[in-house]
Amino acid sequence: MKNRLPADFLWGNSVSSMQTEGAWNEGGKGMSVYDIRQPAEFASDWKVATDSYHRYREDFDLMQDLGMNCYRFQIAWSRVCPDGDGEFNEQGIAFYHQFIDELLARGIEPMICLYHFDMPLSLAERYNGFTDRRVMDAFIRYGQKMIACYGDKVKYWLTFNEQNLYHSPEAFLISGYLQGEKTLRELYLIQHHVMMAHVHLTHYLHQTKPQCLMGGMLAHALVYPATCKPRDILCAQQLDEFLNQNLLRAYAGEGYSPEVMHFVAAEGFDDIYRPEDLALMATVKVDYLAFSYYASRTLNSDAIPPGTAVNNYMLFGNQDNPFLKATEWNWQIDPLGFRTIITRYYNDWRLPVFPIENGIGVIESWDGEHPIADDYRIAYHRDHINAMKAAIFEDGAQVIGYLGWGLIDILSSQGDMRKRYGVVYVNRENHDLKDLRRVPKKIYAWLKQVFRSNGEAM
C-alpha cells in the first residue's frame, strides 16, 4: 500500500508582520524598534514592506489558489498596544479580526505568532527590552489579551519566533536591547525572561482555551563536527545542548538542561532563575514542536578561543562543509539535515513536529515580462519535502504540516528586498517601491500541484 500523508496535513506559508505589513503609522499603530532603523545600500526601511496591511486579500487569494490550508502570521505588538504596556488599540485588534476572518473564509487555518523581534519602541527605550522583567510582564499581558481576543478562531499558537536565538549573540538584536555592553549575564536574563513569558502564556492558553495548541519554536541549523576529532564532536554536542536541547527539554516539561544550569551557577547567574519560575516551568508542556530550517552548519573546534562561552562558539568555529552546495549567502543546502531534525524531535520527545519555515533565498529581479525561472527553488522544496516524507514514512515521525517561508516575496530579516524566497514575485526594490505587483514565478505551478495533491504530485 502506498504511503500517503494525512488528509488534514497542513501546507502553507509563514511570515512576520514587519517584513510584510507596512502601514507603520496607520490604524493607531505605535512605533517599534524597526521603525527607527535606517535604510542602507542593501536594506530598505520598514515603512511599506510588501504592503500586506492593504493587500492581504489579494495575497490570500493567491494562497487559496495555490491550495494552501495554513498561514502562520505574526501580530505586531505595537499595532494592538502602541506603547507595549499601555492601552490596547481597538482599531488594531479589529484589523486582525478581519484578517483572520478572511483567512477562514478561504479555508486557510491561521497560526498566530506573538513576537518576531519587533519590540515596541517605548518598552525598548524605557526598559532595554527583555533584559527587564517588566517587559516580560508586559508581554504576558499582551499575549493574554490576544488569546482572549482570537482564541475562539485560531487553533495554533506560538509565543516567540525562533526562541533559541535568545541564547545566541543575536539576542541583543531581537529583544529590544538598545544600549549596554551585551554581557553574558544580560544574555541569560533575556533568554530566561523570554522563556518565562512563554511558560506563562502556554499555561494561560491551556487554562482558558483548552481547544487551542501552543507550540515551542527553534531556529534549528543542524551543526556537524568538522571532523571525527573528539573535541570537534564535544563542541558540536555542547552547542546543541545550550542552543537547542536546553529549550526542547523545557518545552517538554523537563525544565532547563542540567548542563546549562551548572554553567549558570558557576558563572554566578543562578539568582536570575527564581524558584517559583522553575516550579511553574516544570508544570507546563507544549503541544507541538516547531522549527525553522534553511541550512546546516559545521563547527571547527580549533578556531574557538579557550574560555569562549558555548553560546558564542559559532562566532569563531563556523566552517564551510565541502560535501554540501551553498546558496549565494553561503547557506549550506542540506535536505538530509532536515530529515534528521524531524526524526530526532519525535524520537526524543514524542510530540508532533511542525516545520514552519523552509525555503531558499536568492537574488532575483523581474524583467517586467517573463516569470522568474526559479528551477533551483523547485529543486530545494522538492528535496526538503521528500526528506520530510522520509522522516514520516521511513522513520515514523508524526508531522503536522509543512510551511514555506515568505512564499509571497517579503523583505529579508535584514530588510534586503534582493533576497527573495517567494513563489510569487513582489515588484519592488530596496529603494524603489514600483507598483508592488504580485507576479507568480515558475515554481508557482509546481507548488500548486504539490499542495493540491497533498504532496503526491512532486
Residue ranges of predicted features:
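Catalytic domains of carbohydrate-active enzymes, especially glycoside hydrolases
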Residues: 55-76, 283-289
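A common structural microfeature
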Residues: 8-10, 53, 70
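Active-site region of glycoside hydrolase catalytic domains
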Residues: 1-40, 64, 83-84, 93-458
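Aromatic- and Gly/Pro-rich amphipathic surface segment
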Residues: 30-61, 66
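Glycine-rich, proline-tolerant flexible connector loops at the mouths of alpha/beta enzymes
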Residues: 75-88
